[in-house]
Amino acid sequence: MRLGITLPHYDYSLDSSKPISFSDVASAAKASESVGFDAIYVSDHLTLDLGKYGGSPDSNAECFPQFQSLDPLSTLAALAPITEKITLGTLVLCEALRHPVMTAAIADTISDISGGRLALGLGAGWHEPDYEIYGTKMPAVGERMSRLTENMKILRSLFNGELQNFDGEFYSTHGATLSSPIDGEAKSRLPIPLFIGGKGDRLLRIVARYADGWNTCWAFEFDGYSERVDSLHRACEKYDRDPGSVYQSLGLYCLVADTEKELDEYFTRMCELSPRGVADGKDLESWRKGRLVGTTEQVAEQMAHWANLGVKEIIVNPGFAPFHVGSNDIIEHLGNCLHKACEIADLTN
């Protein structure tokens, strides 16, 4: 089992009283690599409010504060030369915010800088403020799936080293390529794993047809996830693809400690570190449901169950809102506990 972790890159990710800086992200990335995580991930929102996750609005404002984020692709490019082996991933890019040719060119550059360590995740988009800030309206789900399909067609062709001429309903390109004329071979510099985030039936058909991997997050119970895996397998059968060739990663909120007493103390600390309102009304017992929560031995049992459902990588989120991390010692604590859990469950790489 590979282990990934979310990186802090929103203003609320560490200390919501001050803006996030790249030095904060770099420090967290180094801590993640040092403790043995296999991958680090950033997301893609122009801004994010915490109302969806229980956050409280400012007392003098009529709406939730809009927390700013560092750009994901620029951040990964900057992290590439200061890390060594860890995978650098997007979880996930909003397909509508960049033309696929530009996405491919940037991804190819980051892959080159990092020595082939980029994992490119793409999604159909769900956060309406991203579209409003971009100056457009968020399309209905059907149109977003159609746009994602066209985007993936172009990316897949470019990553395969093909000369791309494409006229679609949403995207067009003529003569785009990542191939180099120097060596005469049709290929990009280094292979770039391409995965899709989401869980709907149509999205899983897009995964089966175009993607190397599939991700969904942040809370899932075993039965619900198993049903989604069955849908993925049906999609693979439709396109005559081996389901085992689809790399499954799963994002989960995570709290783990060696003993119940330590787990309770850890939960209390995460509540204290949370942005205002996010931890309100939460208790440890209810937080266990659908999340990677428990003692090291309990989490080992859960991870073994996820592995039996085809999960090859678990991406943990330390806090109670996406990409809320708290502090670097939280990263180190999670890394140490999760490696113990992998050993107990015989899931070490």
Model-predicted regions and their roles:
Residues 57-88, 147-154, 238, 330-349:
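Alpha-helix-loop-beta-strand connector modules within alpha/beta enzyme cores
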Residues 68-74, 198-199, 294-298:
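Short secondary-structure boundary/capping elements
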Residues 52-64, 107, 258-273:
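Aromatic- and acidic-residue-enriched segments that line the glycan-binding/catalytic groove
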Residues 1-82, 192:
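N-terminal beta1-alpha1-beta2 module of alpha/beta enzyme domains
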Residues 88-97, 249-256:
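Conserved strand-turn element in the central/C-terminal portion of the radical SAM core barrel
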Residues 54-63, 130-139, 188, 281-285:
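Short glycine/proline- and charge-enriched loop/turn segments
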Residues 1-38, 119-121, 139-140, 153-156, ...:
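C-terminal amphipathic alpha-helical "assembly" element
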Residues 90, 96-210, 230, 243-244, ...:
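Internal, glycine-rich beta/alpha segment that forms the wall or movable "lid"
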